[in-house]
């Protein structure tokens, strides 16, 4: 995989170039880039190493679910380890370092661990260096080196020079997530006279709409934000809802200055917000699931929607030729978007040809292999090709050693609604066979779940679920108003 920047497109501001350091090298991006998108556009393929065997790691996702692109950001007392490059914004003067590698991620001597993997089984150090010797001297001799090898980034030992703040809020409605369903819900409730707080962990509102980068979606996002602001609602970006407690008390963390080159000295780095709403709407979206196949951790193997998101939002091509392995219709929109952007696309669909999305993709000339699944990625430091096999009606894979050339593999096993916040309240997820995922279970508290967080992945269905939630929230208030009259 060799990433590059498309000549046009994306939501970045190409009139505002930004230069930052990555492992001592100068890298250029643009305003609106994340660390991950800027590195991908600059052709950086290996950005990390695995914890134990130091296998090469690339960028896997485009959001907070990222597990491979973890960096140490800042210097000296301002050094922060294990920062997810997929959500961290770049700014002039930013210092970024790779982690868990020596001398660097491209040539890491720790990769020798892979050669002796049979001897490094889970918990090997407890068996190898403990007993049958008397006492613990043998273990104590090796413990230092084992502990030193553990972990990824290294935290600073200097005192943190930044300041932090805490704030308390009361509101009628707290909406978590500013995708299409979250925006639509917040606008309707605010225009109905409710005091609304809308929080979004990203630095821009829009959710999945940001990936498509078309005029209609951009107009919808702008209109929703404008209407919400005019109605008195509050929008908080770069803000993560991390905890849901008794009485609907919600904990938020707002990142205030990490994206600024020279923040004013009076600004705190982060603010811990404690919100006490009357009702909560969870529009936290869904996360794409990967697929299990050989070497699916190689640089260049990504979540399918992430490949499209880098193209649509950041104007970055993850490679020249992409294989999209999927088991559902949603991936076809991503494949068509990438094909229109100029990438060579081949879709592997584990299912037979039965759906409208499949037929539509065939009509526009997309290369599709039905009842075909990935078996193993070829290539040591990236994707050189993909071995594929046939999947029969019983789900058994039959490999025929067929190899397809590509430098990017996008994989998608469907989506899983983000149910963690409601789980904090003891609500158990419920399996839904129709969407092959866990959905939020029923709750007696004043909490509504909308959009992809409730298992609706079509944009119209997401907005319809928001309408239902708004009606449910406003119904008691309308009844009270009629009683007062």
Name each model-derived stretch.
Residues 1-25, 29-485:
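Residues forming the flavin
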């Amino acid at each position: 995989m060799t990433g590059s920047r498309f000549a046009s497109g994306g939501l970045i501001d190409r009139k505002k170039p930004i230069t930052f350091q990555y492992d001592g090298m100068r890298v250029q991006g643009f305003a609106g880039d994340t660390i991950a998108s800027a590195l991908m556009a600059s052709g950086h393929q290996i950005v990390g190493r695995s914890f134990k065997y130091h296998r090469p790691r690339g960028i896997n996702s485009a959001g907070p679910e990222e597990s491979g692109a973890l960096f140490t950001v800042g210097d000296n007392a301002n050094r922060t380890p294990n920062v997810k490059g997929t959500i961290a914004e770049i700014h002039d003067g930013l210092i970024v370092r790779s982690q868990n590698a020596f001398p660097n991620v491209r040539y890491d001597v720790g990769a020798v661990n892979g050669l002796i993997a049979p001897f490094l089984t889970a918990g090997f150090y407890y068996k190898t260096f403990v007993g049958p010797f008397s006492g613990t001297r043998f273990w104590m001799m090796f413990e230092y080196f084992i502990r030193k090898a553990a972990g990824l980034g290294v935290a600073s030992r200097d005192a943190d020079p930044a300041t932090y703040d805490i704030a308390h809020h009361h509101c009628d409605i707290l909406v978590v997530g500013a995708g299409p369903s979250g925006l639509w819900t917040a606008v309707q409730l605010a225009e109905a006279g409710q005091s609304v707080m809308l929080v979004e962990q990203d630095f821009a509102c829009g959710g999945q709409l940001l990936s498509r980068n078309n005029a209609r979606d951009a107009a919808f996002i702008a209109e929703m934000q404008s209407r919400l602001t005019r109605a008195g609602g509050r929008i908080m970006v770069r803000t993560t809802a991390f905890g849901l407690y008794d009485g609907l008390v919600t904990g938020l963390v707002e990142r205030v200055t990490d994206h600024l080159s020279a923040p004013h000295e009076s600004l705190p780095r982060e603010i811990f917000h404690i919100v006490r709403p009357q009702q909560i709407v969870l529009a936290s979206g869904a996360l794409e699931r990967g697929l299990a196949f050989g070497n699916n951790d190689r640089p260049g193997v990504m979540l399918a929607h992430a490949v499209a998101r880098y193209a649509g939002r950041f104007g970055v091509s993850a490679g020249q030729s992409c294989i999209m392995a999927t088991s559902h219709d949603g991936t076809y929109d991503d494949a068509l978007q990438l094909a229109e952007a100029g990438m060579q696309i081949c879709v592997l669909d584990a299912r037979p040809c039965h759906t409208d999305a499949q037929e539509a993709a065939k009509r526009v000339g997309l290369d599709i292999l039905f009842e075909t699944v990935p078996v193993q990625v070829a290539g040591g430091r990236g994707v050189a090709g993909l071995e594929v096999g046939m999947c029969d009606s019983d789900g058994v894979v039959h490999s025929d050693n067929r190899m397809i050339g590509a430098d990017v593999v996008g994989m998608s096993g469907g989506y899983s609604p983000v149910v963690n916040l409601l789980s904090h309240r003891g609500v158990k997820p419920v399996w839904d066979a129709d969407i092959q995922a866990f959905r939020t279970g029923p709750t007696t508290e004043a909490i509504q779940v909308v959009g992809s967080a409730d298992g609706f992945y079509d944009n119209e269905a997401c907005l319809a679920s928001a309408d239902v939630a708004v009606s449910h929230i406003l119904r008691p208030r309308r009844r009270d108003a009629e009683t007062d009259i």
